[in-house]
Amino acid sequence: MKGLIVYSSLSGNTKKIAEAIAEVAEDSELISVREFQSSMLANFDLFYIGYWVDKGDCDAATLRLLAQLKDKRIVLFGTLGAAEQTEYYDRVKQQVESHAVHSHILGHFLCQGAVGEAVIARYQSMLAVHPQDEHIKQQLANYENGKSHPDEQDLANARAFAKSIG
């Protein structure tokens, strides 16, 4: 089965996961979403689609890509700034999968990634205005803890996930 790994990455986190998957996904090619062309659809049997989370959903470039994947076998993977919170992760997965209802989803991997400094600065500004806001404090703590992600364990988990797909 010939696979195509297509990723969208704002800060490099999803690219790292895509590269880890590419190490173990046999007979697969790795490209950025910017390199993807619809003419490629006929050349592959399996599509690994990597995204970064933007406000609880996949990024816009991935949305456009998913709209083109009708009746395809796909594997989803993504990164987000939040620490592993099962309920939130599940909501994100459901939301992203809702854009691929016309495809056969074989699996979905999600892990924490480091957040850009601009996002952290925005939350710090919000905290200055609302110093008692526990949600903002928790977000900043998550972002601080996430600076090392995706880490070696995340990459190992991504490889194991890809191997489980076959």
Describe the residue ranges of each PLM region:
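FMN-binding flavodoxin-like domain, especially the glycine-rich phosphate-binding loop
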Residues: 24-28, 46-49, 54-166
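Flexible, glycine-rich phosphate/dinucleotide-binding loops
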Residues: 12, 37-39, 83, 117
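Short, Lys/Arg-enriched, disordered terminal segments
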Residues: 1-2, 166
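The conserved SAM/SAH-binding core of class I Rossmann-like methyltransferase domains
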Residues: 6, 31, 77
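N-terminal beta1-alpha1 ligand-phosphate binding loop
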Residues: 2-24
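Alpha-helix C-terminal capping/helix-to-coil transition sites in glycosyltransferase folds
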Residues: 42-44
